Curated annotation (Swiss-Prot):
Substrate binds at S177. Its EC number is 1.1.1.-. The keyword Oxidoreductase applies. This is Short-chain dehydrogenase reductase 2a. It comes from the Eukaryota. Pfam families: adh_short_C2. Belongs to the short-chain dehydrogenases/reductases (SDR) family. GO terms for molecular function: oxidoreductase activity. The active site is at Y190.
Length: 303
């Protein structure tokens, strides 16, 4: 190859690399700069990962959780960094309407706006009480639906009211599950609740689109969060141990269609970041499935 061509190609790649570096660090340094976000279930797992990622991208973040100790500690830790935006904690049980209304009202009163509401709080339910439909436990079913579905509905209600009242074209995101896409992926109550979240998302998107409010949800495959690991450990008996996370991840990998990768909480946080940012400005009523293709592959005959 002529030296001139090699030199021109080298120059092109150098310029290209420089442009990409400047794009990443200068033009788009923070994708949520100036925005205010509420993240329920923000003290642990997917919620915690999202709190940290949103804060890193310039958002003012309000952590909402029933775990006051973990929530307060996380907020204090993130707010201690000089370059970080404000991160606050508000105690909230998403199944209690007064708590959800207070969460939204305090956030708006304190920061003047609400741009992003991430309905992430949820429960898996008692595995032993939901092992078989023949042993259906109505009280346990009501508990799961109260937190997972009622909590999302209340979040949508009060979050949308605040956005509409102040004319903000915000976005509402909810955590669903692959169990809300197909059967046989989780306990009965949990599966019913996640199907309901997908339905609520689509219906709310149809109604709120006229206000410029986008409503979407995320359906992850198995993520080895404390909730999932605890449920798995309780089913087999005993307390959670340090190596249970790795063991759980290995189990999920064995079921996965996409090999060579491990789904972690930060991957779901990245999906939430996309849906919360202006990059998804025309995405509405969508269930973003983050499962490495498992729900597609399991529906394929003979593959």
């Amino acid at each position: 190859m002529p030296a001139q061509v090699i030199a021109e190609q080298t120059t092109f790649h150098s310029v290209h690399d420089t442009i990409m570096e400047e794009t990443n660090t200068t033009l788009y340094p923070k994708r949520l700069e100036g925005k205010v976000a509420i993240i329920t279930g923000g003290a642990h797992g997917i919620g915690k990962a999202t709190v940290m990622l949103f804060a890193r991208h310039g958002a003012t973040v309000v952590i909402a959780d029933v775990d006051n100790v973990a929530g307060s500690s996380l907020a204090k830790s993130l707010s201690s960094h000089k370059t970080s935006p404000m991160v606050a904690f508000i105690s909230c049980d998403v199944s209690v309407e007064a708590d959800v209304e207070n969460l939204v009202n305090v956030t708006v009163a304190r920061y003047g706006r609400l741009d992003i509401l991430f309905n992430n709080a949820g429960v898996l339910g008692d595995q032993k009480k939901h092992k078989s439909i023949l042993d259906f436990d109505a009280d346990e079913f009501d508990h799961v639906m109260r937190v997972n579905v009622r909590g999302v509905g209340l979040g949508m209600k009060h979050g949308a009211r605040a956005m509409i009242k102040r004319g903000f074209k915000g976005c509402i995101i909810s955590t669903a599950s692959v169990a809300g896409v197909m059967g046989g992926m989780g306990p009965h109550a949990y599966t019913a609740s996640k199907h309901a979240i997908v339905g609520l998302t689509k219906n709310a998107a149809c109604e709120l689109g006229k206000y410029g409010i986008r409503v979407n949800c995320i359906s992850p495959f198995g993520v080895a969060t404390s909730m999932l690991v605890n449920a798995w450990r309780k089913t087999s008996g005993g307390d959670v141990e340090d190596d249970d996370v790795e063991e759980m991840e290995e189990f999920v990998r064995s079921l996965a269609n996409l090999k060579g990768e491990t789904l972690r909480a930060n991957d779901i946080a990245e999906a939430a970041l996309y849906l919360a940012s202006d990059e998804s400005k025309y995405v509405n009523g969508h269930n973003l499935v983050v499962d490495g293709g498992v729900t597609t592959a399991r529906n394929c005959v003979g593959l």
